[in-house]
């Protein structure tokens, strides 16, 4: 409330202990979301590492491998994977436009960030790490529109039983059935990647190589 009184319009909550923990944490998270809605504040997080925007000279995250400016936007439910993507950006010199560690994504969801990236003139491709979905149908309907304007490269976590348990404890998100998710991704035009390194390489290609202007291209390897 004090922040809102000062004129703050958006807040990133890095603190954990919400839906990523227990029932009491879930209740606290719902109260946080309700307060943000009451005050008309954009809320990102909680339980995220922060945001980075090299084009605005902004690096506001807990772990901060500051990446060079580029055309790749990053959004992830895992802060560690954001750090990995930014480290690859530093190693390769292929930079990023924006980066968000969404955490529990209690109010502003992964799909909301992807929609904004699709309107961002500084972004040519979005790189996404996703552990689970609660609104699968909504995600599908919105992302298939986004991919018509912006390539999306996605790494899906929580595909094993151990990974599903880790996803639930890490971000408070339920991992989706892998076969269902694969079908959805294929229909929506998402480019799937098996791991972080491959995902960055694919995104780097989208960001640095122009797409063919027509279907008359033959590739020999």
Regions found by a protein language model. Name each.
Residues 1-221:
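Catalytic-core regions of core metabolic enzymes
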């Amino acid at each position: 409330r004090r922040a809102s009184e000062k004129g703050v319009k958006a807040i990133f909550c890095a603190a954990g202990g919400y839906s990523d923990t227990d029932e009491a944490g879930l209740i606290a998270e719902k109260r946080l979301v309700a307060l943000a809605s009451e005050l008309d504040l954009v809320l990102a997080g909680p339980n995220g590492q922060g945001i980075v925007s090299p084009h605005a000279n902004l690096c506001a995250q807990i772990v901060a491998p500051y990446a060079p400016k580029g055309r790749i936007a990053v959004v992830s439910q895992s802060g560690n994977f954001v750090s990995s993507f930014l480290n690859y950006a530093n190693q390769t010199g292929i930079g990023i436009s924006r980066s968000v560690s969404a955490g529990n994504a209690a109010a502003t969801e992964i799909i909301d960030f992807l929609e904004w990236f699709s309107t961002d003139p500084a972004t040519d491709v979005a790189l996404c790490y996703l552990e689970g979905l609660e609104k699968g149908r909504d995600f599908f309907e919105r992302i298939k529109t986004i991919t018509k304007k912006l390539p999306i490269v996605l790494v899906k976590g929580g595909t094993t039983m151990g990974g599903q348990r880790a996803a639930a404890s890490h971000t408070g998100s339920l991992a989706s059935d892998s076969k269902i998710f694969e079908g959805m991704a294929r229909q929506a035009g998402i480019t799937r990647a098996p791991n972080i390194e491959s995902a960055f390489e694919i995104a780097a290609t989208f960001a640095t190589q122009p797409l063919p202007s027509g279907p008359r291209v033959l590739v020999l390897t």
